[in-house]
Amino acid sequence: MKMNAKFISSYDDYQKCPEITKPEYAFIGRSNVGKSSLINSLTGVKNLAMTSSKPGKTQLINLFTIEETWILADLPGYGFAKASQSSRIKWGRMVHDYLKNRTNLTTVFLLVDSRHEPMKSDLEQITWLASNGIPFSLIFTKIDKQSLTQTNKILASWTKVLSENWEELPKMFLTSSESGKGTEELLTYIDEINKQIAN
């Protein structure tokens, strides 16, 4: 289903982002995790978020208004090895400043590649979000690239690792940008949160 999705603008500092009262959902993940493809699949708008075979394409905070009811924030990926250290530090600071200070931020969706065991950089992001009291959910991408058995194996690994530090696990979604699997569940979840906020 094609949604009414419009690009607002790109920003290199959260303080430059417009003050918006609508609930905002941030999407973040390692470079090349399939974030842009998922955003396009989620909204049904093919080129809403620019995709690239080269990691590190997203370098700014990109805001979109969705159905005129909520805001989608496409954040720079982390773990891009070819970026200079100064660039990685700059992106990291920009993203963390946004996540800590954006007043209408409702939930962070942390995207992880379903083909990989828990990675240090992903776990560091999760720990940072939790320690700063920022609500987040996990989105496992590219489940179409492997068997259900392998996906479940990776999911079990994540559950085990997270259970070692947290009693309550974050909500998890299994998605495929190719087939669209998981996008309906994700949109339903966002809609439920929006209704709770409205009430």
From Swiss-Prot:
Keywords: Cell cycle, Cell division, GTP-binding, Magnesium, Metal-binding, Nucleotide-binding, Septation. It comes from the Bacteria. One of its GO terms (molecular function) is GTP binding. GO terms for biological process: division septum assembly. Its cofactor is Mg(2+). Pfam families: MMR_HSR1. InterPro entries: G_ENGB_dom (IPR030393), GTP-bd (IPR006073), GTP-bd_ribosome_bio_YsxC (IPR019987), P-loop_NTPase (IPR027417). PROSITE patterns: G_ENGB. Residues 21-196 form the EngB-type G domain. Mg(2+) binds at residues 36, 58. Gene3D superfamilies: P-loop containing nucleotide triphosphate hydrolases (3.40.50.300). GTP binds at residues 29-36, 56-60, 74-77, 141-144, 175-177. Belongs to the TRAFAC class TrmE-Era-EngA-EngB-Septin-like GTPase superfamily. EngB GTPase family. Necessary for normal cell division and for the maintenance of normal septation. This is Probable GTP-binding protein EngB. It comes from Cytophaga hutchinsonii (strain ATCC 33406 / DSM 1761 / CIP 103989 / NBRC 15051 / NCIMB 9469 / D465).
